[in-house]
Amino acid sequence: MEVRDPRNLSDSEAAEIRRVCGIANMAVYSSPLAGVADKNIARRLGAQLGLAHLHANPLADEDGISSLEVTPQKSARGYIPYTNRRLLWHTDGYYNPPQQRIGAFILHCVRPAAAGGENRLLDPEIAYILLRDADPEYVKALSARDAMTIPANEEDAAAARPAQTGPVFATDAGTLHMRYTARTRSIEWRQNEATRAAVDFLGRILAGDSPHVFQLRLSAGQGIVCNNVLHDRSAFTDDPASGLNRLVYRARYTDRVVNA
């Protein structure tokens, strides 16, 4: 949908974003703010949509919003979002404890890359339904309290965290929450046949050509507002000489966009 200025939505623009998120758990907007490097775009947009609890991860900027661009000092420490490498399917904050679950996030594109940097997105509710309809035991396995463990991060003192064990699917105030990563390193799945089968089936959904997967490449001034949907990012190539070095603002929240 078109918006005049994400920092100052009209009532009808805000209502439409909420409405679409209520249907699909995600909404994509376009604005005239191509190339405008102002993190208030993400901050004010979130506030107007009722997102009040910004969650700053250790690598976020001082104001709690992350500037996702190729950053050597962060990429050297192994943090893929700050490289031009592909990001595998995941939900944000899958390594967080339950009290810090990421309910929503905003991505706002200041500048695209010269090539690449596409996102694919899938509503977790659709993923749940596909798994349930294929075999209810898949959902049962992924809802177990010990379905997935993210080992402790003890290598980087600035982003140290303990191991986190929990379900893939959980409910929070009547809404579905999903924590997932397609990474095969730094993750431990519950060692039983049901969990392995469920993870394999979900992997096939994400690797296939599902009509439920939405694909887009954000242009300058465009953005995504969503209730922490599954997403990935393809590798990309920057060309600073032509001004095409990818910069995306990311704001994460522990609350969700609700259809008021």
Language-model region placement:
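Active-site environment of non-heme Fe oxygenases that use a 2-His-1-carboxylate facial triad
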Residues: M1-N8, V20, D61-R217, G223, ...
